[in-house]
Amino acid sequence: MITPYNEDRSVDYGAVRELVRWYWENGCDGIFASCQSSEIMFLSLEDRIKLASTVKDEADKLAADKSRSQMSVVASGHVSDDFKEQVKELCLMADTGVDAVVLISNRSDIENTSSEAWIADTEKLLNALPSHTMVGTYECPRPYKRLLADKMVEWIAKSGRFAFIKDTCCDALEIKKRIEMLAGSGVKLFNANGQTALEALKYGSDGYCGIMCNFHPKLYVWMCHNFKKYPEMAEKVGAVLSMCAFTESPTYPCTAKYHMNKYENITMSLYARSSQRQALTHYHQTWVDQMKLVCDSVYEQIKDLK
C-alpha cells in the first residue's frame, strides 16, 4: 500500500481510508500496510504506526459488509538497526491489532554474515515480542535485499511462529523449491513479482502481494482465484500482467499516485519521499495511461468468468 500525502507533505489519512475502500472494492483479500511501498524508511515511527492503525480501522468498518470475507491487514514498519528500537516498533505495530506483524529480512544479521547469525538474531527478536503475535517475513529490497537461504526457510517452517513469507526472489523455480520446503508447515508464500505470478500460482503459491495491485488489482484477484478453472485465459492474463510489471520501477510510487488521481478518483499529491516527483515525466505518465487502456480491455474479457 502506498502512502498518500497532502500538499504540505504530511500524511493524508483521509486518502488512506479511501485507498482501503478502493482495495476492498477491487476484491483484494488483504492489505500490506507500512511496507516499502508505504515509504516506511522515510516515515516517522508515529506515522508508521498510525498508518497501519488507520488501515486496520477502515478494514474493520468495511467488514460489516457480509457480502465477502474480511480483508486481512498486515504491517511492518520494521526499519531500525538497533535491537531495542526494533522491538519497540514491532510491539507498537502489534498493538494496532493488525493480523500479522511483518519482519523485514535485512534487519536480522544486518552485516549479512551467515544464515546461522540471521536465525539467531530473528529468534532473539521473536522471543522479545508477545508470544501471541502472528508474524510474517518480507525480503524487502531496501536498504538491501536479504534473500532467504534454504536453511533460513527450513527454520521458518519449523519455528511455529511464522504465518507467511513475502517472497521477492523473482525466480519461479526458487519459489517452487521454497513452497516444497514449506509444505505442511502452515507457512504461506506470497509472491511479489508480476512476471512469475502465474507460474508461482501453478507451483502452489498462496497469492500475489506486489506493487502492481496499486494499478490493476482486479486482474490479479481474478487470476489468483480462477487460474485453475480457466487455464487458457489465465495464460493470456498472466502474459499481460508480466509485461505491465516492467513499469514498476520508474518513478514509483509517483506513477501509482498519478494513476489514483487520474483513474480512481482518489485525490492525493504526486509527491513521494522515496522518488523525485520531477522524474514523473509525460513519458512515464503515458506508460500508465497505456497500461490502463490494455488492462481495462482485458478485464472486460474476464469479468463474467467466475
What are these regions (language model features)?
Residues 1-2, 26, 97, 205, ...:
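C-terminal alpha-helical cap/extension of soluble enzyme domains
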Residues 43-46, 113-116, 177-178, 202, ...:
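Short secondary-structure transition/capping segments
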Residues 63-66, 156, 181-182, 263-264:
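Short, conserved catalytic or adaptor-binding loops enriched in Gly and charged residues
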